[in-house]
């Protein structure tokens, strides 16, 4: 016996000219004007995506993420705010971190973003892992990500 679960777009508030490719799971989130969401994307609750931002395929955006305007999120980016401090998932949402992405940020494919803040105008290299907040505009890459060049 198989259980088939369909993709869902539920309780999404969206602006004008939003494009969402199926299959996708989006719920309890806000999408600004001209947002693009590629296929196989999940955007969880209490998340806001700013106007003119693009979320490419196979990206997972957990709860409590804010993405600014004119941002680019590459293919397969993972946002994670439960750091498994006890070695297992924590169901207490109050303990989850928050992720804040400024305006004009570009995040390369395959990057992992933990509970951090990223200032405006940052470029994150593909495959990078962000473990600490970024307060300086520039190109960042690596595991853990570090500043490679000021912009």
Predicted regions and their residues:
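Short coil/turn connectors at secondary-structure junctions
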Residues: 102, 135-136
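Flexible, glycine/small-residue-enriched loop-and-beta-strand segment within the central core
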Residues: 1-9, 20-31, 35-118, 143-151
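C-terminal/domain-terminus segments
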Residues: 121-133, 139
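Sparse recognition of residues in long alpha-helices and their boundaries
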Residues: 87, 137-138
């Amino acid at each position: 016996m198989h259980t088939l679960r369909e993709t869902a777009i539920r309780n999404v508030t969206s602006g004008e000219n939003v494009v969402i490719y199926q299959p996708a799971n989006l719920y309890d989130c806000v999408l600004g004007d001209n947002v693009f969401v590629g296929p196989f994307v999940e955007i969880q609750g209490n998340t806001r995506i700013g106007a003119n931002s693009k979320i490419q395929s196979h990206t997972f955006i957990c709860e409590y993420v804010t993405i600014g305007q004119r941002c680019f999120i590459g293919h397969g980016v993972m946002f994670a705010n439960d750091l498994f401090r006890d070695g297992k998932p924590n169901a207490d949402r109050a303990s989850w971190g928050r992720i804040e992405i400024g305006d004009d940020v570009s995040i390369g494919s395959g990057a992992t973003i933990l509970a951090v803040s990223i200032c405006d105008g940052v470029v994150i290299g593909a495959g990078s892992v962000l473990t600490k907040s970024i307060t300086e505009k520039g190109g960042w890459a690596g595991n853990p990500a570090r500043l490679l060049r000021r912009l």
